[in-house]
């Protein structure tokens, strides 16, 4: 079967600024910077000797990145593009409530698409579910175009929707010109960071894994509704399925040396889910070797540590118009995922520009967590109670306005 990835798995083991500082003694080796709502590893990161030119590993429950190399470098994503294709498709399908057993006819344009593909001809039909299966499992380029044409009228219109979604997600280093990644255009690019954000959304919404976890699947080709003509076996391009504990996704990519071998992987072990991205590995299976190394690291000595609990007071600030301080409490538990070998934590409550009145539960700032003076995590602060502007300040404002 034709594919855009080849080879077999090698033998590998598996930021008005008010602040308050508090000290926490704990051990932690991973320190991070904050970008796009994620937190990133910034010190004591081991050299994993990875082959990809851009790599990233994150824990998905708290969007915490624990390993990174050139994660913001723009790269040609090749077939990894298809995770945005599927994410955009799910948005449309869910919005329009389209049944997954809907039949989709293959156009002449879709039928002639080259590269990784399924054997299907003009006028033949597949269900929507089968098209998505072919895209995710088998990386089928022609299925991607057929899906795009069905949902948006043309690939070009569908790609516009992909880029709109990227903009809405805040992906400033991502742009698409193709729905399947079958392009070498310098206007088609993304980063490991942006790709991780797309993949994370797919994981959180839950649809992708029921496709990406499948190693083999038969789909039926029809010459008309309820008129089957043959079966096609889909074989996953993900060589780690069944070979590495907990792996259940999600997408490979390759377009020659320009893209290198790419892979977005995810695995869940004992309730912890990790997400990895490798872009630009030049040797065959380098994308999978990188994934194994990152997963081994992330599942190694790491554990969860709760530093502070939900509703715990984390800082206070004075606001013009009241003698009372605005007190910030945690909206959620403050949890860190790390390997805790060394270090010291401190917290800094950074308040937004506040104006009265303030309502109980209103977001008023962010609590940053530091380790060795580097940001390792962040949490939202909300007001512990209502704070109103005192009558004396209201009266002073009115008197002032009389003379202005």
For the regions a language model picked out, list residue spans one by one.
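Basic polycationic patches enriched in arginine
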Residues: 14-17
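Active-site-adjacent loops and short helices of periplasmic peptidoglycan-processing enzymes
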Residues: 5, 40-206
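Domain-terminus/edge residues, biased toward the C-terminal soluble/receptor-binding domains
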Residues: 171, 175, 186-189, 193-404
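Hydrophobic core
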Residues: 32-36
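Cleavable N-terminal signal peptides
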Residues: 30-31, 42
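Sec-dependent signal peptide recognition
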Residues: 22-28
